[in-house]
Amino acid sequence: MDTLSHALWGRGLFGYKGKPYWSLFFGVVPDLFSFGIYFLINIFNKSNSEVRVSIETELPNYVYSLYDITHSLVIALIFVLVVYFFINNKLAFAMLAWPFHIVLDFPFHTAEFFPTPILWPLYDVRFDGVSWSTPLVWFSNIGGIIFLYLYRFIKNKKSN
């Protein structure tokens, strides 16, 4: 799934209990802390004038390691539970955008392009899903986001 969609799903599903911006942030955390770090390093690396990620791009090993860590339901749920029990339950609710990101990713990433290791480090299970750029998946995603925000808008209007 694209990063913007993850942000919108995170905000729409988990941003209505007082932490809307945190839900946006946690919706993109898995991509931000894997590909985002790579992107920033390349911006500041003077030898590269362009930053493009494709199937043909040779990525450094740390990107794959960070992807495994940030795209694991095990890791995400540990963080959410620690925050829930020891810090702030409203923040923990917004943080649920992170595991939801993972749940959205694993059926829509192919084996060729970052299959999602949802049970890492316990099990290195990865699924060969349908590409999120497939028209049926892409338009269903957009339709789902529109429906979610219309629902939130109507529900908010009725309560005010």
Ranges and model annotations:
Residues 1-160:
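N-terminal membrane-targeting hydrophobic helices
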